[in-house]
Amino acid sequence: MKRNRITNVIIVVLVIAAVYQTGELWLEGTAGHNFFRAVKESISATDEASESDALLATRYAVGDGASNFSVYYPDKVGSSDMLEKANDVLQEILAENIGESTELEKADWKEMLQNKCIVMQYDFMINMDDYLEGMRSLKNGQDLDSFDYITIVPARRTGEESKAYFVNSQTNDCVVYRAMKSKSAPILFEALQAEPEGEMVYISTGQKTSSAVLRRNLFLPQWAELPYQYDTLRQVPAFEQDGAVSRVLLENTAERFFRNFSVDWSQRDENGNFVFSDSSVVLRYNPGSRMLEYYNYENYGSDGPKTALLDGYQISCNFMTNDASLQTDVYLADIGGSGNETVYYFDYAVNGLPVYLSESVQQEIGMKHAIEVTVSNNSVKKYRRYAVNYEASGAKDASLDVQFIDALDAANRLYQETVEQREIADVKNIALGYFADRTEGIRLQWFVNLYDRIFLIETDSTLPEQTAVTETEPETVVNASTNS
C-alpha cells in the first residue's frame, strides 16, 4: 500500500468516525456498554492459527494408481485426516528442497496420476510466493507465478522418491519438487485408497481423454448404469423451530462469540433483527434473510502487515468452529480482499458434493457465497453466514441420467444459441452439485463453465432443459500477503 503518513492519519480518522457512527446505530439502547473500551484480550479459541497449518483445498482427489479416483470435500471445518497426512508429506518434500532450483515444465497428467497420489484442486488461482511464504529460501528457477493444483505422489518406502507438483491449469505449466527422505510418505501411501461413492465413480480427464477442448484436468463423476437414484436436499434454518426463531438456539450460538456472554446484552432493533453486543463485538441475526453477522471493532483502524495466506485460512476455520449452529460441511470457494484484509469465502457441501446458491438467494443475502470470513492482523474482523444447514431427504427421491459429456454438449449448444456462434476451444470447468434455488427437493445439476459463462444443465432428461446462464468474473490470482 502506497501511503504517506498524512494520508494514513486521515484514513484512520475517517475509519474511526465511520465505525463510531455504525456502532451508535447498532448499539442504540445499549448505552451501558462502553463501545471504545480497550479490551486487549482476544478470544484465543477463535483467533489463533493452529500449530500445524493444514493444507487448504477446495476439494481433493485420491488416486489408487489404477485409474480409480474418489473426490472429497473437507470432512472437518477446513481440513480432513487425509489432508493433514498430505500436508505432512508436502512440508517434508519442500524442506528437502530448500536451496535447490526447480525448472518450469509442462504438466504431464498421465505421468502424475499413474501412481498413488492425492490431488488438491482450487477453484481460484493462488500466488506461488504467497503460498510458500514460510519457506522463502526455496528456489523457483523459472518462476511459476500462480497455481490451482497441487499433486503429491508419495513414496512407498522412506528412501524412495516422493514428488510434489504445483500446476497452473491455465498455462499447463508446473514445477516439481522431489525428495528422498520423507518419513510421512509411506503413511500417506498406505492411506490412499480410492473408495467409489456407491454407483458413482470418478475419472480424470487429463488421464483418460486427449480432447483439445478438455485441456485442463478435471475429476468428473460417471455411472456405469443409469438412471442413478439419489437423495434430494432440504434446507433447515439454523435458528428456527416450528417456523419461528428459537431464542434458545440463537443464544446458544451467540454466547460462543463473546468472552463473558449475557442475555441482557440482546435486543431487537427496529427492523426485527436480533442484536447481541458488548464493548467490542456485535452479533446480529436477520430472521428475514437468515443472515448471521459478527463484527469485531477492536481491529478497525489497524494498519499492520497482512496475515499470511495459510495462517488466515486456519484462523478462519478455527473461528467457524465457534458457530455451534454450523452443522453442514463447508469448503473453501475463493479468497479475496484488499489492503491488510483477506476475505475467505466458503460454501456448503453435502454427501461429497457442493451446494451452489442460486442467483436469487445470492441477491437476497447480499453474498455470492454462503460464508465470508474477513481476517485482519491475525484476527477475525468480520464473519457473515447464510445461517441454514442442508440435510439429505433419505428417500432416493430424484433421478439422474445425464452424463457429463452430454451436459457439455448441451452447454455448447446453449452457448451457440444464447451468446455467440463460436467454436468452444476450452472448458474452464464442469461440476456436479446441488442447486439451492428452493428449500425442499434440492436436486443435482451440471454446472458447465465455458469462457465467461456458467450454464446450468439438467441431470434428469425427463425434466425441462435449463437455459440459465450466469456471467462469471475474470479469474484472478489470490495475492494474500503482499501489500499493494
Name these PLM-found stretches.
Residues 53-54, 60-61, 308, 369, ...:
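Secondary-structure junction/capping motif
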Residues 1-15, 23-26:
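N-terminal Sec-pathway targeting helices
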Residues 175-194, 284-295, 357-383, 454-484:
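A short, surface-exposed beta-strand/turn
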Residues 11, 20-311, 319, 482:
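Preferential activation on post-signal-peptide N-terminal prodomains/segments
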Residues 393-397, 404-407, 426-473, 477-479, ...:
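Extended hydrophobic
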Residues 78, 82-103, 244-258, 300-341, ...:
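Short, non-transmembrane alpha-helical segments in secretory-pathway proteins
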Residues 374-406:
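Short helix-loop boundary/capping segments
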Residues 250-296, 324-377, 427-457:
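Exposed beta-strand-loop-beta-strand "reactive/processing" segments of non-cytosolic proteins
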